[in-house]
């Protein structure tokens, strides 16, 4: 047996003594990546006013990050398998932190957009590599608890970003939504360089550059098509062209993976029921969460006349409930099983979406979103534990990349679907019946999606005996 094999076997049998502090550091890094989405969204109006950015440029401040993040995550996961997760975590953190500094210093659109794309690339390296470390450091019930904490920080971070974005833009200014990442990133860099175990490389071979380019192009085309569909309609000519281009690129990627001796990923992973179930749940949960956060924050600011800061304060219970539900789900998952927990969580989510339809006003909106968020927080744990619960060490990085990619797919689908469903409410004037009907329609669509997903999850997620 080789030294590498011995180390790998030992790591699998003996829990790493610093695994919980490492989880805390990696979770904080993931929180920073998730916060960067909603914090920036809240600060967009202030950026536009100060830098004289038009609507297209502001859209790309968000889209550029999402495109780079989503399209490169499979590559990030595979590089973690090939070159070592620690090396890729630190490289991603360095790139993200440096890009955050550049974004805060930006005095116009070119530097800001370049920095945002670079942030997304750094996040795409960091996120799947960090998740693969969590999967390899923990096993059994401990893995469920660890994934619960990971999901709590990710899910709660999206809601906390609304509050943090309001506080920063009302205080030191929009640039600090980026500058705040610099000291946090540097502290994490020093701490992780010292504490993150240098796990044996999970896979050998060379990096499949053509495969990485094909899947990145396909994913970027699909995410951009979804973004455009939300703004310009699902039958927009360019959106349809992008959807077709994405399908063609994915087909070419699949064909190349079957031919090349060192593929980027084993396509048989996508034939495993737990992986398929996990990516289905993560996509649905993310789509619903992004959708409800978009709807809730827009309703509170444009329909109830709350400012950005007050909207952030109102979202604080949503963040706390999400984090508590995810942490709790990680503790009970082994006892009740993923299938039962997913169905219950989706039923709770659907019930929460109905509250703003049946009652109107700020209290009803916050209550409904909080109830829905409790179900969604649990779903993130179910998704991660189902997809990653039994992966081999050499597949941890690429499988984490797949899960993370479908997280971004879900976010893009959620934003596009909600934007379309609520178009009447968003276009209408504040306080009119048309606006209220538009929001009701969007929440009814979300309710239907959650209910349908519960039925699919009951069939798709393996039972505990399988």
Q: Could you tell me what each predicted segment is?
A:
Residues 19-44, 55, 61-65, 130, ...:
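12-transmembrane solute porter fold
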Residues 50, 86, 98-102, 217, ...:
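Hydrophobic alpha-helical segments
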Residues 12-13, 203-206, 213, 256, ...:
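Short secondary-structure boundary/capping segments
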Residues 80-87, 143-146, 201-207, 263-271:
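Interfacial helix-loop-helix linkers and transmembrane-helix boundary segments
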């Amino acid at each position: 047996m080789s030294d590498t094999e011995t180390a790998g076997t030992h790591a699998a049998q003996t829990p790493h003594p610093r695994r919980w502090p490492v989880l805390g550091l990696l979770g904080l890094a993931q929180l920073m990546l998730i916060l960067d989405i909603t914090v920036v969204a809240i600060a967009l109006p202030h950026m536009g006013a100060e830098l004289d950015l038009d609507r297209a440029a502001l859209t790309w401040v968000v889209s550029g990050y999402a495109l780079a993040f989503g399209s490169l995550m499979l590559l990030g996961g595979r590089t973690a398998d090939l070159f070592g997760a620690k090396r890729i975590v630190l490289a991603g953190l360095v790139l993200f932190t440096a890009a955050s500094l550049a974004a805060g210093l930006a005095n116009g659109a070119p530097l800001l957009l370049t920095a945002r794309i670079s942030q997304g690339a750094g996040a795409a390296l960091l996120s799947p590599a960090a998740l693969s470390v969590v999967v390899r450091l923990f096993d059994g019930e401990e893995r469920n608890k660890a994934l619960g904490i990971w999901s709590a920080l990710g899910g709660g971070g999206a809601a906390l970003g609304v509050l943090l974005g309001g506080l920063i833009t009302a205080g030191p200014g929009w640039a600090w939504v980026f500058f705040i990442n610099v000291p946090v990133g540097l502290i994490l860099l020093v701490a992780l360089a010292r504490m993150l175990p240098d796990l044996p490389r999970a896979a050998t071979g060379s990096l499949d550059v053509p495969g990485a380019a094909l899947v990145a192009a396909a994913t970027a085309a699909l995410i951009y098509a979804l973004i455009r569909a939300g703004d310009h309609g699902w039958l927009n000519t360019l959106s349809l062209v992008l959807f077709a281009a994405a399908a063609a690129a994915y087909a070419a990627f699949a064909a190349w993976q079957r031919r090349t001796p060192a593929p980027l990923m084993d396509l048989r992973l996508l034939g495993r029921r737990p992986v398929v179930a996990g990516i289905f749940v993560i996509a649905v949960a993310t789509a619903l969460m992004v959708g409800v956060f978009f709807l809730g924050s827009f309703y509170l600011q444009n329909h109830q006349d709350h400012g950005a800061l007050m909207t952030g304060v109102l979202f604080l219970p949503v963040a706390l409930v999400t984090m508590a539900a995810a942490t709790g789900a990680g503790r009970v998952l082994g006892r009740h099983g993923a299938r039962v927990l997913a169905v219950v969580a989706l039923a709770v989510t659907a019930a929460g979406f109905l509250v703003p339809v049946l009652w109107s006003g700020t209290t009803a909106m916050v209550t409904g979103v909080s109830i829905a968020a409790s179900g969604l927080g649990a779903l993130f744990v179910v998704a991660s534990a189902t997809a990653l619960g039994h992966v081999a060490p050499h597949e941890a990085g690429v499988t984490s990349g797949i899960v993370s990619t479908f997280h971004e797919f879900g976010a893009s689908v959620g934003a596009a679907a909600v934007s379309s469903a609520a178009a009447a409410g968003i276009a209408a004037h504040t306080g009119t019946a048309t606006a209220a009907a538009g929001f009701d329609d969007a929440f009814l669509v979300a309710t239907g999606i959650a209910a349908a997903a519960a039925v699919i999850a009951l069939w798709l997620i393996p039972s505990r005996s399988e």
